Amino acid sequence: ETSYTLNEVVPLKEFVPEWVRIGFSATTGAEFAAHEVLSWYFNSELSVTSSSN
């Protein structure tokens, strides 16, 4: 069994709008494969401000 690890820090603030949803996508072409996310960490330094609607 082959195992791969991907570890990448991406400054999302430079690429995405203020409100965004994060997800995963993977493919192997025509072959079958199982893709497992064994660990996920997300950190945000977003300053939350309250607003009256």
From Swiss-Prot:
Protein name: Mannose/glucose-specific lectin alpha 2 chain
Superkingdom in the source lineage: Eukaryota
Molecular function (Gene Ontology), one example: D-mannose binding
Transmembrane segments: none
Keywords: Lectin, Mannose-binding
Pfam families reported for this sequence: Lectin_legB (PF00139)
Organism: Lathyrus ochrus
Self-association state and partner proteins as the record states: Tetramer of two alpha and two beta chains.
InterPro entries: ConA-like_dom_sf, Lectin_LegA_CS, Legume_lectin_dom
Family, as annotated: Belongs to the leguminous lectin family.
